[in-house]
Regions:
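Polar/acidic, low-complexity leader/linker segments enriched in S/T/G and N/D
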Residues: 1-17
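Short beta-strand-centered interaction patches in the first periplasmic/extracellular domains
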Residues: 75-89, 121-192
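An acidic/polar, Gly/Ser/Thr-rich interaction patch typically located in mid-to-C-terminal regions
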Residues: 15-44, 182-314
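Short, charged, solvent-exposed linker or helix-capping segments at domain edges/interfaces
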Residues: 90-96, 174-177, 310-314
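Surface-exposed cap/loop segments at beta↔alpha junctions
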Residues: 38-118
Length: 314
């Protein structure tokens, strides 16, 4: 791993004595994170940006959040924690506004273009009204619209491109990777079996969405929500997301491999060993670690489940 620091005075420093570096990418988090420990003496310079490369490919492009330098009997050491460039969209509030027939492109132009991001989303739009409320972040304003229309969130890659986070069409086989360890986890404490809700003109929770998959698996976990204030297209998205999100930690694999995994988040995988057979698992988190002992990558995967939603009204 090659790491380049850029100071507030635009001076570039390529680290030569890295003790450890950990790059974390998570589908649920807007920002990737990179933590670094090194013994290069950078003195009192203030770091603004951090770049990380793997085999000359840019894998992290972000901003320094925290910088700590220590001198003791062991010598000089610095710790840096950085978040990817998506932090610019996360840390800034969007101005509140009600859009009529907005598209992802129109929100990008309003909220992200001037910050240097590039638009790489498909043609996502709605013919309805969309409200960006006070306190929403720039990231949240764009992500919510794209998610409600397409069912997929957005992601910012290392090239500052806003792309769609969607499930891969192909399925790779993890058995071809140099695997160090495998852990299988089944968590039955979270999946929701049904959502009961109120919509406009409802006085009771007389609208229902249940998961046929949850029923078949023996789950009985109900939620009651008041959705009177939401438009139908926003309401349907919220209910569907509640059920789907509840299954994310149901069946998981944690696999540590030797070296680096270049696969993107939401890549689908199959895996089979003495621990069991695992078909169609999504890559939800990737933790790449580098130190004097070499490099390894921890992959956290979740079962790709069709929750089979069924709707009915009393």
């Amino acid at each position: 791993m090659k790491i380049v620091l850029i100071t507030v005075d635009n001076e570039e420093i390529t680290l030569k004595n890295i003790i450890s570096a950990v790059l974390t990418q998570t589908a649920e988090a807007a920002c990737d994170s990179l933590s670094i420990k090194f013994i290069d003496n950078i003195k009192a310079v203030e770091i603004e940006k951090v770049l990380a490369y793997k085999d000359d490919e840019l894998i992290f492009n972000g901003y320094c959040d925290c910088q700590k330098s220590t001198v003791d009997e062991k010598g000089f050491q610095t710790y840096i924690y950085a978040r990817s460039s998506a932090c610019l969209l996360v840390d800034n509030d969007a101005f509140a506004y009600t859009y009529n027939c907005p598209s992802a492109l129109s929100l990008f132009q309003a909220y992200a273009k001037d910050l240097g991001f590039k638009f790489k989303l498909p043609n996502v739009y709605t013919l309805k009204k969309y409200e960006v409320t006070s306190g929403a972040s720039l990231f949240g304003a764009i992500n919510s619209l794209v998610s409600m229309i397409s069912g997929n969130g957005i992601r910012i890659n290392a090239s500052n491109e806003i792309i769609m986070l969607e499930v891969s069409k192909d399925i790779l086989n993890l058995n071809s990777y140099p695997i160090l360890s495998v852990k299988s986890i089944i968590n039955r404490s979270e999946p929701i079996s049904a959502v009961h809700y109120k919509k406009e003109f409802s006085s009771n929770y007389d609208c229902h969405t249940y998961s046929k998959s949850a029923k078949d698996l023996g789950f009985s976990r109900n939620r009651y929500v008041n959705l009177i204030s939401l438009a139908s297209w926003q309401r349907n998205y919220k209910i569907s997301k509640m059920i789907k999100d509840s299954f994310k930690n149901y069946k998981c694999l944690e696999i540590t491999i030797n070296g680096y995994c270049s696969s993107e988040l939401y890549q689908r995988f199959n895996y089979e060993s003495l621990i069991g057979k695992f078909d169609d698992y999504l890559l939800l988190e990737k933790i790449y670690s580098y130190d004097k002992n070499g490099e390894k990558c921890k992959l956290v995967l979740g079962k790709n489940i069709d929750v089979k939603e069924v709707n009915y009204v009393d």
